[in-house]
């Protein structure tokens, strides 16, 4: 059978729950069919489902597939064999794990991001301005540790979430004769989903290229501050990039992590910002989740992620100055 970019011999691919008997098979030959894949792995145990993923347009194999054993012990047998070859090509079987759901964007919050502040604006100016909308619990500006000058952006926390709605509805505000932009602050979990946060500490100097690519020249180094783990920043927050869909946060974070690992910049893209079609995590590289609701929720264990095209950052560490001293 052939449907939704896959070709299999039995079973259903619509079950997104983790199946301990399910394996991701990478490195398949273009000639490998579900039948030949089944024939090879049947020597390890009874196979409940077998499929080769295909491009929905060209119908060509995408070079990977899935095999689900009736007995999870068969997976150990496969992994216990150091070398696997099928159709004169070395293949790479791995345990398939469900892909975690991406955190949703926060719609109700007490904290806002304020960007585009003038150089002479101090934290008291920011607090005084926003108090006209409601009680301010805290206000802070982000400072460069080297120059001890603020970088043109900060955060304000209100006592009431409704105040945030009112402030962000206006969007642009004038403080000290300069228009500033206000956005809802987003938890770090949105910026760096679980599994990438451990490497997020390496991002400050690689994400600058991304920030510049998004046109955020007015307040660079934002991610260098939030996600750096400075004392008192609990929870950390990120800025909701203008015009950037929430669904894209996962691939961007993955690409940034790949950049932190040492990927070079993309010479075809000035500023180091990846193209619109740059691949995301391995599941996106092999095909969008929409092709198959069950398969799209799986990734292979320890499979590499593609490079991102992010360049190196340009600025140094930041520190925060807050209206209250709870952040120092």
UniProtKB/Swiss-Prot annotation:
Give the principal location in a single coarse category: cytoplasm
Tell me what turns on expression of this protein: Up-regulated in astrocytes after brain injury.
From what superkingdom does this record's organism come?
Eukaryota
- Region annotation (Disordered) ranges: 1-28, 264-286
Assigned GO CC terms:
cytoplasm; cytosol; intracellular membrane-bounded organelle
Q: What is this protein called?
A: RNA-binding protein Musashi homolog 2
Work out whether the entry's keyword set contains Ligase: no
Species for this entry: Homo sapiens (Human)
Enumerate the Gene Ontology biological process terms.
central nervous system development; regulation of translation; stem cell development
Changes after translation: Phosphorylated. Ubiquitinated by the RHOBTB2-CUL3-RBX1 ubiquitin ligase complex.
